[in-house]
Regions:
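A SAM-dependent methyltransferase catalytic signature shared across enzymes that methylate proteins
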Residues: 170-186
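A short glycine-rich, Lys/Arg-flanked "PGG" loop and its adjoining helix->strand segment in the class I
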Residues: 117-129
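Conserved hydrophobic/aromatic "anchor" residues
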Residues: 94, 99, 166, 179-180
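Conserved N-terminal segment of class I S-adenosyl-L-methionine
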Residues: 1-95, 101-105, 114-120, 186-189, ...
Length: 228
């Protein structure tokens, strides 16, 4: 799926359906705590939950997203001004070594081969030496499970615009050429207050499964790396 079509999907979810990101809040709050009180760039703003959590922790938070509408809404809600920019991960509009941390949560799986490598290199460019890259991707996703068909053109596509699936080895292979101390772990993040009792029981089972070394379709791969 090309960048224009990806943009259509995410412009819809971020501007017309920001409520759809509620299940991601636990994951985003975790990443905000990991980034800490630093100058941090979040790539892909969703409903702004990461930015809100980072500001509450005292971070100097910046945001980048291809959706101008989502950026305008975030600026208005959190008073970020020029710290929130519309743009691409392959051409980040901040100077070399500007950030202590870059966060990319549920971003990499949307990128084609060339864009993925270019984005990785841009993350490294805007991080200071020793700065940290943090993020998540779906764990071992079966892409076909989320394939849908357009009823107008009959073209099949991934409902969220995912281009690839990752396992820990694939993430390490991607990041190691530009980053040191690459670490990957499988985690289940649960936003408990969004669930009824049945959902909570299911979430407990998923967390327990991953804790004993199993795999869950609801899990994420949490990665951290340092700019050399």
């Amino acid at each position: 799926m090309d960048a224009e079509r990806q943009g259509r999907i995410w412009d819809y979810w971020q501007t017309a359906r920001p409520d759809s990101f509620g299940g991601a809040h636990a994951r985003l709050r975790h990443l905000a705590r990991r980034a800490g009180r630093t100058r941090v760039l979040n790539v892909g703003i969703g409903d702004g939950a990461f930015e809100e959590a980072s500001l509450a922790l005292g971070a100097d938070v910046h945001a980048l997203d291809p959706s101008a509408g989502a950026v305008d809404a975030l600026r208005a809600r959190l008073n970020l001004g020029e710290r929130a920019q519309a743009g691409s991960a392959v051409q980040i509009p901040w100077p070399d070594g500007y950030f202590d941390a870059v966060v990319a949560s549920e971003v990499l799986e949307h990128l084609d081969d060339a864009t993925l490598l270019a984005a990785r290199d841009e993350f490294a460019r805007v991080l200071r030496p020793g700065g940290r890259l943090l993020g998540t991707v779906p764990a071992r996703e079966q892409l076909s499970a989320n394939t849908v068909v357009c009823p107008y053109c009959t073209r099949a596509f991934h409902r969220w615009g995912h281009e690839r699936a990752f396992d820990p080895a694939a993430l390490r292979d991607l990041l190691s050429p530009r980053f040191a101390a690459v670490a990957v772990e499988e985690r289940v993040f649960v936003t408990w207050n969004r669930l009824n009792w049945k959902g909570r029981l299911t979430a407990v089972a998923r967390v327990a499964l991953v804790a004993v070394g199993g795999h869950s379709a609801a899990a994420n791969l949490l990665f951290t790396a340092e700019r050399a």
